[in-house]
């Protein structure tokens, strides 16, 4: 999935912003969260998040659920590099493993446990 954030901002601008954020908030992780293509789940109101490094993926999913006001019976899945990360994994570990060359961690969310087409 191509990130809309990447399309809207140049690499240099994104890299400079991520570096500035990491210097100012060394214990936080800059995350870009966008809705996956072809899902009927609501669109999130903001894409940029500064998450504590000790936050788990499960806790981050909870934050996303609240932001999109998702009904409790509806499922939500988040993907990093088209992979479903473990719920108990720390966002700092996911960041170190999957951060983009611009310094942001790109996360997409969907109402289905699939990525792309079948």
UniProtKB/Swiss-Prot annotation:
Pfam families the UniProt entry points to: ATG8
Top-rank taxon, per record: Eukaryota
Gene3D superfamilies according to UniProt: Phosphatidylinositol 3-kinase Catalytic Subunit, Chain A, domain 1 (3.10.20.90)
Lipid linkage positions (Phosphatidylethanolamine amidated glycine): 116
Record keywords, A-Z: Autophagy, Cytoplasmic vesicle, Lipoprotein, Membrane, Protein transport, Transport, Ubl conjugation pathway, Vacuole, Virulence
Deleted gene: phenotype: Prevents vacuolar accumulation of autophagosomes and affects survival during carbon starvation.
GO molecular function: phosphatidylethanolamine binding
Topology in the lipid bilayer: Lipid-anchor
Free-text description of this protein's post-translational modifications in UniProt: The C-terminal 2 residues are removed by ATG4 to expose Gly-116 at the C-terminus. The C-terminal Gly is then amidated with phosphatidylethanolamine by an activating system similar to that for ubiquitin.
Protein name (Swiss-Prot/TrEMBL): Autophagy-related protein 8
Propiece residue ranges: 117-118
Matching PANTHER family: MICROTUBULE-ASSOCIATED PROTEINS 1A/1B LIGHT CHAIN 3-RELATED (PTHR10969)
InterPro entries: Atg8-like, Ubiquitin-like_domsf
Induction conditions: Transcripts accumulate during carbon stress conditions.
Protein family: Belongs to the ATG8 family.
Coiled coil (residue ranges): none
GO biological process: autophagosome assembly; autophagosome maturation; cellular response to nitrogen starvation; mitophagy; protein transport
Site (Cleavage): 116-117
Primary site of residence: membrane
Protein's job: Ubiquitin-like modifier involved in autophagosome formation. With ATG4, mediates the delivery of the autophagosomes to the vacuole via the microtubule cytoskeleton. Also participates in membrane fusion events that take place in the early secretory pathway. Also involved in endoplasmic reticulum-specific autophagic process and is essential for the survival of cells subjected to severe ER stress. The ATG8-PE conjugate mediates tethering between adjacent membranes and stimulates membrane hemifusion, leading to expansion of the autophagosomal membrane during autophagy.
UniProt key word Transport: yes
């Amino acid at each position: 999935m191509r990130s809309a954030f990447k399309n809207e901002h140049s690499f240099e601008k994104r890299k400079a912003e991520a570096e500035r954020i990491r210097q100012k908030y060394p214990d936080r992780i800059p995350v870009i969260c966008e809705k996956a293509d072809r899902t009927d789940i609501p669109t999130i109101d903001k894409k940029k998040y500064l998450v504590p490094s000790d936050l788990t993926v499960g806790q981050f999913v909870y934050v996303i659920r609240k932001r999109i006001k998702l009904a409790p019976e509806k499922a939500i899945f988040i993907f990093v590099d088209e992979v479903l990360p473990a719920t108990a994994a720390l966002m700092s570990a996911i960041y170190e493993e999957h951060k983009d060359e611009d310094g942001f961690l790109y996360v997409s969310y969907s109402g289905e446990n699939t990525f792309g087409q079948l």
